[in-house]
Design a protein with these regions (language model features):
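An acidic, glycine-rich surface segment that forms the CoA-thioester-binding/catalytic face
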Residues: 30-42, 65-105, 137, 152, ...
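Short, charged, surface-exposed hinge/linker loops at domain edges
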Residues: 211-220
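Conserved catalytic-core motifs of eukaryotic protein kinase domains, centered on the activation segment
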Residues: 61-62, 127
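Short, active-site-adjacent cap segments at secondary-structure transitions
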Residues: 56-60, 109
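Generic structural signal for alpha-helix termini and adjacent loop/cap motifs
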Residues: 19, 43, 71, 85-87, ...
Length: 260
């Protein structure tokens, strides 16, 4: 299978499973990713997702150009229908407010980096390499790279990476805020799982509302963002979890949240 979908408790791990092709996204993988993200989004028992790549070499090298070119390139607008949901389903058009963790086990290039940019927190192996290299092949980032990267790192650095098509190391990615942590390769998935465990101990509805507030707020004036934050905060007050949290605090015990 081009994709592995595994669930342990409330944590889903989605693994790009084409290590022989640096986990590049071919049409089959693209379709399976759309199905996987839809399944994760709609499953009430799935609270956090981890996305990673099989093998030790690559998270993902992006679109498999050999297999994607016939349907995505060659004439103006050729790739529009193919990209309605964006590469892998999450780069455009699918809103997922549940948190997603990227466990970057190697190269994250072109569309692979764009997939990573859709994740909320990112841990990278020490040998990982990052880049939006599309201009080398006379194409441009088309799965959100030109929009998300400048929102995460200094604009000058985003310009450098995109216009020159150059790569950067894991250490540089951490320095500029592109990843949250850099760890030895053997610790990438354990770190992602530890983070997922921490998030699962928090109020799941509150976590989702907070993520939604952050993402939507990035494109809003501050006053509008504050109104949206107040609205989302208000929607939590009538939930069972919002009763359980303060009650557990008062009783000096660990809360038991049910996403209700």
């Amino acid at each position: 299978m081009a994709l592995l979908y595994e669930q342990q408790g409330h944590v889903v791990t989605i693994t790009l499973n084409r290590p022989e092709a640096m986990n590049a996204i071919d049409p089959e993988t693209h379709r399976e990713l759309i199905d996987a993200w839809t399944r994760f989004r709609d499953d009430p028992e799935a609270w956090v997702a981890i996305m990673t790549g099989a093998g030790e070499k690559a998270f993902s090298a992006g679109a498999d150009l050999k297999k994607m070119i016939p349907q995505a390139f060659g004439s103006p607008g050729a790739g529009r229908s193919h990209n309605d949901l964006g590469l892998g389903g999450i780069t455009r058009g699918m809103e997922i407010w549940k948190p997603i963790i990227a466990a970057v086990n190697g190269y994250a290039l072109a569309g692979g980096l764009e997939l990573m940019l859709c994740c909320d927190v990112r841990v990278a192996a020490e040998h990982a390499v990052f880049g939006l290299t599309e201009v080398r092949w006379a194409i441009m980032p088309g799965a959100g790279g030109t929009q998300r990267l400048p929102r995460m790192v200094p604009v000058a650095k985003a310009m450098e990476m995109i216009l020159m098509g150059e790569t950067c190391s894991a250490q540089e990615a951490h320095r500029i805020g592109l990843v949250n942590a850099v760890v030895p390769a053997a610790d990438v998935l354990p770190t992602a799982r530890r983070w997922a465990g921490i998030i699962c101990e928090r109020g799941p509805l509150a976590v989702r509302a907070a993520k939604e507030a952050i993402i939507r707020g990035l494109s809003l004036p501050l006053a509008d963002g504050l109104r949206m934050e107040a609205f989302l905060s208000g929607t939590l007050r009538g939930t069972e979890d919002a009763v359980e949290g303060p009650k557990a605090f008062a009783e000096k015990r660990k809360p038991v949240f049910r996403a209700r």
